[in-house]
């Protein structure tokens, strides 16, 4: 496996120089952040980002993500224009030599948490999802904001989107996802760009909005929409592992042996209720996921693709984007590399 690290570009307080100093770090996961959702990413911007990362001694391993416009998810008549723009972006990424694109199909909101600075017993802070707190939230107030959300939505935009989604149930969302996949994956095949859909985070419906990339059955349904390695998965241990009904290691092995795991997000979560969890340190004993078994499974199907430590705690007084500090993710990367070395040497 190839260790990578999420970087938010020039506005990220964590420099490429610091990321390069993490032992075993090979690549960067990033995106173009100043192009509005639905517009084509210019080739020159992609090449400039790639060159900046290569000049720092690493490679641009994964684009995360090329966002999918809401009109596509809603199945509006305008979707064809946005799908063609998406395909043109993939062509530009392919021309620039980008090989993997992570994306999601979550309506309106990306990953969702109820608190960004929950204090753990050791004094560190972490992201937490408390079902009761989320149920009390009003997403239409315009006051909620999380690092993964599209900040361009106004209060009026959100109200309109929620009105639009009243007509979209899970099966309609599946239909709209299938329409998107049938148009996009042939272009990905032509450009040799592996697509890797990210599971919904958390993997259940929120705020009355449908979510469908949530469990083994639905991931199987997804890959069967278009039978190609280019129609693949981002296997995120924290997202899928947040639902105690999901056996993440079993899912990882199953889809890995099918050759459909194109990217891996590795993080741990501690389950504290049926639909409540804390994000923990990567160490197995700190959470509910056995990270040794995760890495052992990756080795078992000879995974050579990119992996990145996902959301970390804030430790040692660090401040910045919640979940995306340097220190805990660097510890996570080193821990994962250590596990992989041990598994590899033990299986020679």
UniProtKB/Swiss-Prot annotation:
Annotated EC: 4.2.1.8
Functional note: Catalyzes the dehydration of D-mannonate.
Family label: Belongs to the mannonate dehydratase family.
NCBIfam families: PRK03906.1 (NF003027), uxuA (TIGR00695)
Protein name: Mannonate dehydratase
A molecular-function term among this protein's GO annotations: mannonate dehydratase activity
Pathway the protein takes part in: Carbohydrate metabolism; pentose and glucuronate interconversion
Cofactors (names): Fe(2+); Mn(2+)
Catalytically driven reaction(s): D-mannonate = 2-dehydro-3-deoxy-D-gluconate + H2O
SUPFAM superfamilies: Xylose isomerase-like (SSF51658)
Top-rank lineage group of the source organism: Bacteria
Keyword annotations of the record: Iron, Lyase, Manganese
Enzyme class: lyase
One BP term from GO: D-glucuronate catabolic process
